[in-house]
Amino acid sequence: GEYCHLNVYNRSELVTDPGIRCDWALALAPTWDNMYKTPGVLGGSIWSGIDDIFQMPNGDAVGYGPWGPIDGWRRPKPEYWDMKKIYSPVRVTTEALSPANELVIDLENRYTYTNLDELRITWTYGEEKGTAFADLEPGEKGQLRIRLAHPEKANELYLSFADPRGFTADEYLI
């Protein structure tokens, strides 16, 4: 069934309160988390990935359906970024770091068929950079460990997870 339509039906409210677009993710996130945890649920889909125009039988284009997280010119709308994060197959559940010679980051692999060892994981911590490795089967939770030479020189960790094709699966700043 359908769920979590974008806030497009009340155009006057979008004009007077464009921030309502951010509230969309507040409904999508718990819905998706519950679907993910429920056996037998295969997932869901966005009603329209890209905004539509309507072709009439005579060839005329009429109307505009603003339902997609990507607009008619193929530009991501604000909802796109929330959707990408919520549907991400990689979850980092660590919210804060304790500076140490080894950072430990809790992960969840939400892929169905892909082990996280197939992803390229890159990290930046201050001036230190590197790649990391996580061997987590689909559906598993585990930890990513990053050794640091100078943990005292930074306080934020940037992580990037790229799939075998080079597409970014997700990014985190902790």
Question: Residues of each region from the PLM?
Answer:
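Alpha-helix C-cap/termination motif
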Residues: 37-38, 149-151
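Glycine-centered secondary-structure boundary/capping sites
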Residues: 54, 88-89, 139-141, 165-166
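Edge beta-strands of extracellular beta-sandwich domains
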Residues: 166-174
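Extended substrate-binding grooves/exosites of carbohydrate-active enzymes
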Residues: 1-106, 110-117, 126-128
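Beta-strand-rich binding/interaction modules
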Residues: 102-135, 142-147, 153-164
